[in-house]
Amino acid sequence: MATAGGSGQPLCSGPPARTSALPAKKEFDVDTLSKAELRMLLSVMEGELEARDVVIEALRARRKEVFIQERYGRFNLNDPFLALQRDYEAGAGEAEKKPVCTNPLSILEAVMAHCRKMQERMSAQLAAAESRQKKLEMEKSQLHVLQQEHRKLSARLEDERGKNKQVVLMLVKECKQLSSKVGEEGEKLEEAASKLDAEKRKTGELEGALSAERQKSSQMEARMEKQLSEFDTEREQLRAKLSREEALTADLREEIDKMRKTIEQLRKGNDHKPSLSLPRGKAKDRRSVSVSVGTEGPASRAAACQTDPVVEGADPVKKPPVAVPAKPSSAGPLASGTTKGGVGKPSVGRQFSHGDLLTSSSPSIPGPPRIQENGPSSGSTPEPTGSALMPLLNNAPPPAASQNHSLTSSTPNLHSPCANAASYPALNPRVQAARFRFQGNANDQDQNGNTTQSPPSREVSPTSRDNLVVRQLARNTVTQALSRFTGPQAGAPASPRAPHPGEGGTGPPSGGRASAKTPNAPRVDRGNPPPIPPKKPGLSQTPSPPHPQLKVLKDSGRPANAGAKVDSKTGVPPPSAPPHGIRVMNEENLAKSSSPQPPPKPAGDLAPAVPAGCALPAVAASQVGACLGCNPGPSQPACSESSHAIPTAIACSSSINPVSASSCAPWASHSLLVAASGWPPSLTPLLTSCGPVSLGGRPTRLHQAAAQGNVTLLSVLLNEEGLDINHACEDGSSALYSAAKNGHTDCVRLLLNANAQVDDADKNGFTPLCSAAAQGHVKCAELLIAYHADINHAAEGGQTPLYLACKNGNNECIKLLLEAGTDRSITTSDGWTPVHAAVDSGNVDSLTLLMYYGGPESENSGSKDQTGLGSREESRGAMPVISADLINQADKEGWTAAHIAASKGLKNCLEILCGHGRLEAERKDKCDRTAHDVATDDCKHLLENLNALKISVRISVGEKQPAVCGSDDFEAENTICALNIRKQTSWDDFSKAVSQAVTNHFQAISSDGWKRLEDLTFNNATESSVGLSVSSILSVKLGSVTWSTGQSFSQPPWDFLQKNKVEHVTVFLSGPQEGCLSSVTYASMIPLQMLQNYLRLVEQYHNVVFHGPEGSLQDYIAHQIALCLKHKQTAAGFPCEIVKAEVDTNFSKEQLVELFINSACLIPVKQPPVSKKVIVILENLEKASLSELLGDFLAPLENRSSENPYTFQKGNGVANSYYFHENCFLVGTIAKSCLQGSDLLVQQHFRWVQLRWDGEPIHGLLQRFLRRKVMNKFRGKVPSPCDPVCKIIDWILTVWHQLNSCLSRLGTPEALIGPRYFLSCPVVPGHAHVTVKWMSKLWNAVIAPKVQEAILSRASVKRPAVRPSPSQGQQAVVKAALSILLNKAILHGCPLPRAELDQYMAEFRSGCFPLSMVSSYSGSHRKKGESGSWRKVNTSPRKKSGLSSSQTWTKQEATKDGVRNDTGHQNGNSIASLVKQKSLENGHPQVLHLDQRLSLGSDDEVDLVRELQSMCSSKSESDISKIADSKDDFRMFGSSRTDPDPEFSPTMSDRSLPSSEKEVCPLSSNPTLECSNNTPKPESGVSRVKSFLPVPRNKVAQCSPNPKRSNSSSSSNTRQREINNNLKEEFWVLRKNIQ
């Protein structure tokens, strides 16, 4: 046993040893081991377990050996007990044997199990200990941190205390300094005020002295001006006299020179020139007219001769001159030019022969030898002939000087620079210089025949102006005379590109005429450049005058160049003959150069000149053989920019061919036939398109007749046999082509009926239909199409008739061709389509037709619009009929129609192109440029917005809008703008755009006036005047998706909005639910700052009352403030409830107590305060007595605690005590401007918030509200101030302000009206009468009853009403006041015209006074300073005597009764009046004749009379009548006032008659009526008391001594704000303090 016990001892010692090792293991922290160490520890532990298992297995295998060893190895023979035991065990059976001692294996297993349990228990205890240790460490760390923070806060608190002490000390010091400074500033202010008064006095004195000096200076200036005018007149007279003397001297010198030359020529034996003889009888007449240039004197004798004007017959009805015969010769241009016949005798009796040639030597430039008619004249130079001058009073240009000149001139005007601009070697350069000097400096006629004068150097008196006209005509005459010598040669025509004749080139001879030039003729110096000749002869817009008569030459034996001489009977044209030449307006060169300029090269000699705007007649053209060739293709219209500059009104260039002999034969038979057939009223520009052919050729005549539209000649020619009607000229054009080109429908019909080829094209491939379409001749085109012309024919360049029509903008032709089914897609050789042509020319209507005409929409609109265009808005909604390929067709350069429109800035065309849904705006040309790359700025903006989505932005008002009386048209959302969302728009851009739109809207509605959005400066950071900004936005809804500013989605805005089909963006503002008042501010237009201030007052004082005039939104403000306060308290965790009660006349104090108790405002004294917040709103407190209703609650409300209880006794006699707790808020509303009587006792116990009509927030509320309403109607845009809607809104604002101002002046504050009634003003653009009707209803339903009640209550406030109905005097006062208010406040400024307003006058309840008595209340018809409707009113009594009058009316006519007021005492005064009264009851008017007397001593009507007197006796000037009465006439009762009583003349008027308070009508301002005994006749200068009562027009007209002053009684339209605490004498009171 000892062995067993000894052997077991080591086994049982294991667990204690492991237990003793636990404290050592505590130092081993598993949490601090790394991952690798933890893996090592795990592996070690696993190895230990495996080793333990091996040991156990080994012990089990060796248990027998161990047992034997333990049992027998230590036994010996010394112990007998051991031997016995051994024997016992060996002898007995194994089953019966019992172990002597415990099995060691079982002991080992038990020990091992016990060790395992202990190990698990210790591990659990170790883990718990570790967790507790960790928690303890964490708490220790937190405690340490808190201790550190506590130390820091303590230190900071000490620092703040020190700083606060320093700040307090500094503030105290600053307060002391400021107080001392205030005293010093007060002293300085007093000193400055005294100095200011002194300066004002000095300034007044200086102003008086200055005004005196101004008067003196003005008088001196007037005298100086008079003297200067006299000096100017005298100077001009002397100048005129000097010019006459100079002219006379020059004429005498000229006569002397000519006589000397004549004598010399006679001596040489030149007797064959009878034209050189000068009749002496005419020399005397020459001295009567001055021909000198007004601004220059003659430089030398030779120059004076060269610049003398040549006479031109100006009056065709004067006696014709004697023709000077001339022999046929081959003389040069000068010789032929000097043999022209004379002209008409001037009106001054002065006349010269055109054959007077004065010769003088030319030493500077030797001229070549020249051939003269009767032999050479060596060394002689022809000079212009002097002539007389006749003033052309009718501004008619002079007729032709010679027929030869008319046949050879190529000028559109005699005075045109291109008329005589050619330089010829046979002329003296001094002559040319003089000629162009007159052309450059003279204020000659412009190209339309109008006299265009340059500003004269001095033009003071009429004499100088007359002299200027004389000088002007002198210059014109000289220019005409010189043009004859510098005109082109008749026999030397030249093409525009031919060499100049002066440079050595010579033209072919014509008709036997020999050239006068020699091949070696030197060039003449051309001097300075001449004015630029006109380049657009086809732009003349003057009508075509009658065609000139054909002049038949009698001398058939003369050559062609001798045709200058004509018979004297035919040489003078009839009075209706057109001026010689063609006047063509040059749009590019209207301003002429003032310096002399040399002549340009001649553009070519054309055949006979015709009047402006007319084509050349066929006969006249054929006489010279001038046939005009056409450009390739049909000619452009006369106003086309590409037309060449030629003299006649044609649009194609022409090369002039030599004259054929046959064409000049005057005896040709067909010439007479054409002449006899009659000229058409209008000659076309394109007369022929063939070469020079004989006039006898029938095809030529056929072309000419077709071109001119001569149906008679054309029908004669078509009836001839053997005529080829399809004959083509050199350019390939036929007669049908010419007729179609010139728009002669009858000729086209004749040719087509004669089987002319309808598609016969010219050399360039243009058919008659192409020509008609290009020129816009729709009737011709319609005929050609009816005869099956090819509508898709393409010329050589690919131009189709549709292309040409689009190019020239001929919409009717386009429509005709489209109806005929022409192809829109045919391209030219350059790749252009008709769409390109229409866009290139900028024809919007043509492009619209191309894109939309032919569809169902255009068919429907065609019945409404004859042109088929329809409105552009309708075409935008229609579907285009052209394909996408055609709209995107590119030319050779890759340009589409969009490229062309964008590059030229044609925004309208580009907008129509963009209307096609399949336009490829991003298509590039061959240079990789899109339409956007080549576009202008406007077109770039249009292209950027091509695919943009237009999303309207709205601001939700919801249920926060104020309840408006009678308004049912308020919208829950207001549209503020429309955003363009493009594909490239990001969410940041979208957020900025929305924010900017909201900010702009806030700024617009709160700005002054109708300023446009672009005129205002906006900034996101700044708030509007109402306090709203971007921060006021709560959320934004994109359709049904909620979005906030700055938020982004995965899709871009464009895709997101298009996918969700968002049509508008709704902006929600922060409201009372969020504890904010932004939405309330926007809904009511009350500034946010003021609402926040009201909320603060309710939270701070708990007892607040809002009071103001009726309709000042007191109830709305109280409810919104309570709602916001409720949500704020709820958000803070306090339950809150709003209790609303409406007070009426039957509302008792017991009901109020029950309300307080039920709402938990009053709680029993024994009950502790509750945490529930209660807001009680008492509305309409003005209907009850405040002292009776709230008198017992004043102390408990002011001191809320159980110490100040309120004892309430119930009906059963039980009395309970209650008190108000701190969580109760009481808000009241009163529709009254001020308290009176006993109610003033309640005032000090509440916080009162006054809502004044003339102060914010009420003063500008109506303006902001109506402006927002107007902007909503105009989709967020601000209309122009001139828009009728703006004018009607301004009128409504003026009505409200003027109405309250007048009521304030009348002393009736209870009648003041808030803006609530005016918020329902209808805004209907284009229907101003709707607003006027609404105003009449508002007047009848609200304004008039309130005014009537207020006036009656004022008049009878001193005594109770004895009678159930108002007396006649009271009714008279009410009607007079209503008439005053109607005309002064309501009708004044109405934008409706007078006639329209007359129709609505019967709807206003104020009487039936004729509207003619009302002054110009429409502000649009009078200037602001002239408006007589508003006058500054000061109702203090007048101190001067005046005149009074009385007016009475009957039903049919107004009759005047004298009202005499005798001077007397109180008991002797009486007033007699006759009043017409119209009863409005049951709609039947009744006339009441009141003949009763109102005693001034009675207490019944005296107050009313005094009130009427007070109204009519203000210091403002009245426009109705004067009250003729002395200040001593009325002495009523003893008055405490020291000032004399104002005068009064009672006037009874109908309540429906419109009148004016401060001005009524343009009646006489000082009518003389029957006056009192003391003042029988009014004197001028005596101050008169003004009456505001209406006066009939007929009576005023009878007694008005000066009717011209009827409209002069107007004053400035200025008003100032009326303040309730003004002086008593500045009010219109309806009751005086009478003792």
Curated annotation (Swiss-Prot):
Record-listed Asymmetric dimethylarginine modification sites: R484
A Pfam family it matches: CortBP2
An example Gene Ontology CC term for this record: dendritic spine
Keyword Repeat included in the entry's annotation: yes
Extent of Polar residues compositional bias: 402-414, 454-466, 858-869, 1432-1452, 1546-1555, 1563-1577
Domain of life: Eukaryota
Region Disordered: start-end pairs: 1-20, 193-219, 264-469, 483-582, 856-876, 1420-1469, 1531-1624
Protein name, UniProt field: Cortactin-binding protein 2
Organism: Ornithorhynchus anatinus
